[in-house]
């Protein structure tokens, strides 16, 4: 399975509008962070290839152009906040070109929020609207021949979804991982986890909290995402443990193909 970081930034992105700090002004492309999202490419046991988005970020059009994305076979949503869903309208072109409805997967409150925000896409079937199907889950499910495990975690007071697919897991916008969820994530080979700031934040792990969770979960390797402009990429890399890295936009990882 191929994992592409479409974006590694927070809701403001980096550079931040109006900010002239050294990170926002940095010429290093690794310090330029679109909103956090992933593209997963896998081939199931039947040889069927799939391109799956994790969240439809506010920057999805730009992200799709960067990686020459020509098809979307599904979307896994972590939660319903603006930086994770407002790019949904960019799915229109994929439905038009391929003549398909794209399945969306998320918790019930996430799907309800999407239906409300994009009600024009569901109240009629007029030309020019996204062609999508809403799907909720209450446990693991099969997505195009692959076993997907949604894992409940906390984003301040709301429950959102992390995901484990084979030996890869994605945990962003998280402030706490309940014990039962930690057991589901334990021993994962590749963990992507959010680390918004250096200081504590009510809705997101800080750097130290993310590092604590990486150790708690006994992840083989970990990649930090949802990084604010407090972090300069090269400096952050130098202070991290050997098995932990700062992700950046365009980074591609390879994981074992997930099984059904």
Q: Where do the protein language model's features map onto the residues?
A:
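Binuclear metal-dependent hydrolase catalytic cores
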Residues: 1-171, 234-260
């Amino acid at each position: 399975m191929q994992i592409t970081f479409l974006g590694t930034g927070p809701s403001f992105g980096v550079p931040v509008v109006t900010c002239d700090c050294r990170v926002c002004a940095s010429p290093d492309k690794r310090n330029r962070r679109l909103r956090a999202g992933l593209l997963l490419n896998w081939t199931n046991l039947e040889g069927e290839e799939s391109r799956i988005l994790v969240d439809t970020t506010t920057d999805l059009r730009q992200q799709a152009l960067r990686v020459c994305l020509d098809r979307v076979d599904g979307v896994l949503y972590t939660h319903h906040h603006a930086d994770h869903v407002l790019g949904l309208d960019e799915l229109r072109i994929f439905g038009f070109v391929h003549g398909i409805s794209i399945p969306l997967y998320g918790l019930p409150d996430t799907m309800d929020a999407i239906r409300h925000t994009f009600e024009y896409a569901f109240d009629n079937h007029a030309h020019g609207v996204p062609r999508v199907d809403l799907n909720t889950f209450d446990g693991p499910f099969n997505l195009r021949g692959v076993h997907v495990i949604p894992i409940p975690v906390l984003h301040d007071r709301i429950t959102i979804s992390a995901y484990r697919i084979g030996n890869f897991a994605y945990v962003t916008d998280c402030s706490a991982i309940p014990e039962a969820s930690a057991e589901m994530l334990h021993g994962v080979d590749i963990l992507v986890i959010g680390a918004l700031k250096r200081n504590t934040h009510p809705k997101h792990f800080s750097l130290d909290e993310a590092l604590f969770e990486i150790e708690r979960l006994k992840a083989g390797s970990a990649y930090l995402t949802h990084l604010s402009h407090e972090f300069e990429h090269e400096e952050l890399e130098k202070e991290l443990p050997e098995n932990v890295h700062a992700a950046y936009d365009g980074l591609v990882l390879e994981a074992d193909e997930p099984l059904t």
